[in-house]
Amino acid sequence: DHRDLHSFPTRRSSDLTIGGAPGDSLTPVDIVKFTYAYCEKLRERRPKAEGERYKVVVGKDARISGEMVENIVCGTLVACGIDVVRAGFASTPTTEMAVIFEQADGGIILTASHNPKQWNALKLLNEKGEFLNAEEGAAILECAEKEEFNFADVDTLGSIVEEDFTDRHIDAVLALDAVDAEAVRKAGFKVVLDAVNSVGGIIMPRLLQRMGVECIEVNCNPDGHFAHNPEPLPANLVELSEAVVKNGAHLGISVDPDVDRLALICEDGKPFGEEYTLVSVADYLFSRIYAEAENTGKSLEELSAPYTFTSVSNLSSSRALRDVTEKFGGEYCAAAVGEVNVTTKMKEIGSLIGGEGNGGVIYPALHYGRDAMVGIALFLTNLAYRKCKVSELQKSYPQYFIAKNKIQLSDKALIDKILDSMKEIYASENVNDIDGVKISFEADRKWVHLRRSNTEPIIRIYAEAPTEKAAEELAGEIIGIAEKIINQ
């Protein structure tokens, strides 16, 4: 599920991550096995002539177990004869960028994203600084289970160098054509930042300072003692909302522990809506090209090159992205849930912008990964140009409400029965089954998405409509039908 992708038992492979709570399901021995298996598969994927070295970047968020996990991962890489670039405290997108900067063969990020502080995990990257896919992850798990080790001899051990990539990442964000730090500086914004005492507390204030933004810091000490549940949902952002109002700030900024998700708070203390982070950034990028096309007479395709005038999000994300894309004459495409599925679809159609409705912005002009830094830089540029309040900006977008529910089942076998029945019952509507079953009721601008959990006998149900009542009613209708099927 794109909202709790990382809360898995040990030895589950997703397109991202292998992990658990250290000492419980992610033991030091497991870390050695997984890292060794990663090295084995890396060599298979990128064969080199004898004597040629492999290089892997390792970065971590500020979790309490981070140093322990980092030492074991780096030691194992060295024992496998691989040279390590130790990036230290780094956001997930920074480590992804570091793989590109270093022209490395891969990367390992030590983070459990928005999970509670006792969790940690290894996120595995390829030579492009992008997540391995599910098949590659499964191959690594299979290799790890064999426990057959063949380490380097003493003359071919790897080396470790330390390097901080924070400023290079910020430089790359500020160098983007669509980012206008000067306009942001002139706007004189004051923001409150909540970085949940992780690595966002290092990179975000530095980026904001370079854009001339006054930044009031809340929970910005990267000690891994998360001040609240680290998932950037409204219930966890009460302290931030209060600080925005109390300080008379223009905006509240919340990031998760590894800084790939961005949630915003309006100047009145109300949530901007994490679904709307991506919507707002896309609206800015499309409107910018559209205005240039109007002024120059050039085509949208010409002006968005080398990308296409398209957007992508996953099936559980708000329809608002499709609406703003189509408003400017662009085309929207949906992908299965999971960052690697979104980026695969984006590459396939050459999207200008994409991401996930959980505050994950993917801007390929920088790199193919969710990145809160590029998200906030684009958002603030737009806010400076629009010269309006954040709450007014939010109201300018199509308004939708998402109801989130789940059905607990006694038997996993019922999942397919329910999903298949839904496809039959709603066959006259627009049905997408690339990832569970999504039924779109076009005339009413509403949809419902049923997805199986990877780890337990649960069906998650997301329903979206233009009003909260309509979303809840749609979810209720689907749950009612599911219960009848269960009781047959």
Language-model segments: residues:
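Positively charged, low-complexity/disordered segments
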Residues: 1-10
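An N-terminal, well-structured beta->alpha segment
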Residues: 7, 14-75, 79-80, 159-191, ...
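Buried hydrophobic positions in well-ordered alpha/beta secondary-structure cores of metabolic enzymes
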Residues: 11-12, 58, 95, 108, ...
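N-terminal small/polar loop signature for handling phosphorylated ligands or for N-terminal nucleophile
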Residues: 40, 44, 55-119, 206-265
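Gly/Ser/Thr-enriched, mixed-charge loops and adjacent short helices
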Residues: 120-247, 297
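Gly/Ser/Thr-rich active-site loops/lids in small-molecule metabolic enzymes
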Residues: 133, 217-219, 270-289, 339, ...
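Phosphate-binding and adjacent anionic-ligand microenvironments
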Residues: 250-251, 290, 297, 303-488
